Design a protein with these regions (language model features):
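Catalytic core of pol beta-like nucleotidyltransferases
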Residues: 1-54, 58, 62-68, 78-147
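Acidic active-site catalytic centers that drive phospho-/nucleotidyl reactions
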Residues: 70-72
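Short hydrophobic/aromatic beta-strand micro-patches
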Residues: 74-76
Length: 147
């Protein structure tokens, strides 16, 4: 369940489980946000087909900002998962990040990959604000069809 935003417009620290429907209800409060959720749904369907089972959402999308630019996120890498199968969807090169933003409105990274600026894995990096204080993310389990 996605909690209410803090006074700072962030989620309480932790990974808050949600379904796509809960995401629509709680975070789809502007046209821009609903458009981003539609792109996210398309992306999650493709990612699920590549073996992704769990994703974490972050960025301005999981704040009270009415018009977030995109959705940032990361996904758990499952044992034996072929990351190359993700290439058509999420090229792991910074040169192609704009393509995933344009196609889906989202940017995803492997959760255990280190974010260069912070030196932390993306999942840890996403759970801190710019000042280093803890904040929340949305966690989604992909089981079969995305719903």
């Amino acid at each position: 369940m996605i909690p209410d935003f803090t006074d700072e417009g962030l989620l309480l620290p932790g990974a808050h489980e949600a379904t796509l429907e809960e995401l629509r209800e709680k975070l789809g409060f502007s046209r821009r946000r609903r458009d981003l959720i539609d792109g996210l749904e398309r992306a999650l369907t493709l990612m699920g087909g590549c073996g992704v089972r769990r994703v974490y959402l972050d960025g301005s999308f999981v704040t009270d900002k009415p018009r977030p630019g995109d959705i940032d996120g990361c996904y758990d890498v499952e044992p034996g998962m072929d990351l190359q199968s993700m290439y058509p969807i999420w090229p792991l090169s910074h040169l192609n990040r704009a393509r995933s933003r344009a196609a889906f409105g989202v940017e995803f990274f492997p959760a255990d990959t280190v974010e260069a600026g912070s030196g932390q894995p993306f999942l840890q990096f996403f759970q801190r604000d710019r000042e280093g204080s803890p904040k929340g993310v949305v966690a989604m389990e992909l089981r079969g069809e995305v719903r």
